[in-house]
Amino acid sequence: MSRTVDLKNFRNFGIMAHIDAGKTTTSERILFHSGRIHKIGETHDGESVMDWMEQEKERGITITSAATSVSWKNCSLNLIDTPGHVDFTVEVERSLRVLDGAIAVLDAQMGVEPQTETVWRQASRYEVPRVIFVNKMDKTGANFERSVLSIQQRLGVKAVPIQFPIGAENDFNGIIDIITKKAYFFDGNKEENAIEKPIPEQYVDQVEKLYNNLVEEVASLDDQLMADYLDGKPIEIDAIKNAIRNGVIHCKFFPVLCGSAFKNKGIKLLLDAVVDFLPSPVDVPPAKAIDANNKEISIKASDDANFIGLAFKVATDPFVGRLTFIRVYAGVLKSGSYVKNVRKNKKERVSRLVKMHAQNRNEIDEIRAGDICAVIGLKDTTTGETLTDDKLDVQLEAMQFAEPVISLAVEPKTKADQEKMSIALSKLAEEDPTFKTFSDPETGQTIIAGMGELHLDILVDRMKREFKVEVNIGAPQVSFRETFKSTSEVEGKYIKQSGGRGQYGHVKIRFEPNKDKGFEFVDKIVGGRIPREYIKPVQTGLENAMNSGPLAGYPMIDIKATLFDGSFHEVDSSEMAFKIAASLALKEAGKQCNPVLLEPIMAIEVTVPEQYFGDTMGDISSRRGIIEGTEQRDNVQLIKAKVPLKEMFGYATDLRSFSQGRGNYVMQFSHYAETPKSVVNEIIANKK
């Protein structure tokens, strides 16, 4: 079977935004105007195609990323709609890892919001080209120019309007294309009735100014265009579009469009921008991989190469079981074939291949380079693992996921629920790398940990609905961490003689702080002081021991451990002995390396009417918060602050109380920071 769509006509893109900016509504309109669906479902009615989970329909928010495919102007578009709530940031992370482009959706009244900044940073980390869609131009308080300014100031990027709205709020009735200098007026809420007219007189000067600014900006990215511009030559429309496309692909230029997804205004022009400016798989740099010799190689998108793909998501389907979503970077994968999981060095059979449309499946025979699909039949492959054919032994770059910041205890209501709960937790943890479950060694309770109260609430609800498990839950707890503040060289020695073969493991390890870099293990053994087969057990022993820190038993993070010396016994040494020796070394380091307790710090933005500004500032300060700035927005005050998560429980209720229900806030994880001594003493006392 040959390729039906040329690779240069593929677009793999996602839609990302702050919650309530209109991502899913934009996705629904893309499906409708591209002919993929024939009836529009609204998010607020619980009828959108892309929000298919029961919890999504009930709450009117996106919880899991949903994939679909549409066609537009001879191009095949793979679209992934991602959540906007910070608790589900894992869905954005793994989607951006495999996408070639993205649409960043903004609320025209709010401009850049906290989660906008978060997803923008995620996209920048993976160097994902983006176009920006200022949505909700029909909303009260909508301001396109202010939104563009917020992009430039808060995101610090070259954001240049290529469209301008005709009117705003209730008077929003058209869009001016800055590139072509054409105006499009909308008849009611049906974009197919858009009428091209001359630019209204009151906008002519504004458009000319924006056009000159646009040409100057794109000319700075294209030498020939710059020469023509300086010589006063007329600039062709295609030349401008090509320069914009080149700038977008290299993440040096971010075109800004506008519209109202809910009112069907600007969606077709947005689809045109996806085709015109976002890259195909052959336009982006080749994927990087590490071969068996630990050398970096490039994976070029080609059907003729050996198969290599990345599993970026695992989901449980009630009808077909485990679904593994993959992006194919090279080669062809056929239904019924075998793939190799490189990390686990294990072969698995591909039972079936399906293209997804939200929760609906369309079975296909094969998937080719540059495309995205779901695989049925893979039992052991998890998120971030590389799949290849037998001829390749390379691994694509893995994904990095945030550590959980909140936890709570769960227990089955009946004995019959016990086994079902274990199965449910295991499957949910397979799906979500930011969801952790473990047993408290002191109480024996099962603890679940995640990115926020809503995250855990949804997971508990899924246990009840999907797995029929009834559980009791405890109060939410902060997920503290421990680390070292100073450097020390320590020794760990495990020697046991009790008749017969003994145990012998001996290590010398240098421990030092490794701020914001996680755990790093360095092997500096030379001259065979410790045989190679015992190096990995030393690392494993440290990783296991780091699950319980020396201060209060919390997991340890941000530590660099350098194994530089040690010894072994020809007969008595074993992997277990070196694991224990490593754990003893860490225990000794806990006495010498100045261990400290870390607490999660949250970035919050509080919006309150002017008269409650003082009370709000005082309340934040009383919670150990640090005010980072304030901003006047229309008739309300916006307060930005960093506050320990420990102090934020119950904040929603308190804010409603002292603002008479007129205040609101958003919160997201910022970083871990050292906990004050007084708080540490309280926490340690409570743990005893």
Swiss-Prot record:
Family annotation (Gene3D superfamilies): 3.30.230.10, 3.30.70.240, Elongation Factor G (Translational Gtpase), domain 3, P-loop containing nucleotide triphosphate hydrolases, Translation factors
Positions of GTP binding: 17-24, 81-85, 135-138
Molecular function terms, GO-annotated: GTP binding; GTPase activity; translation elongation factor activity
Entries under SUPFAM superfamilies matching the protein: EF-G C-terminal domain-like (SSF54980), P-loop containing nucleoside triphosphate hydrolases (SSF52540), Ribosomal protein S5 domain 2-like (SSF54211), Translation proteins (SSF50447)
One Pfam family, short name: EFG_IV
Keyword Cell cycle: no
Family label: Belongs to the TRAFAC class translation factor GTPase superfamily. Classic translation factor GTPase family. EF-G/EF-2 subfamily.
Protein name (Swiss-Prot/TrEMBL): Elongation factor G
The gene coding this protein: fusA
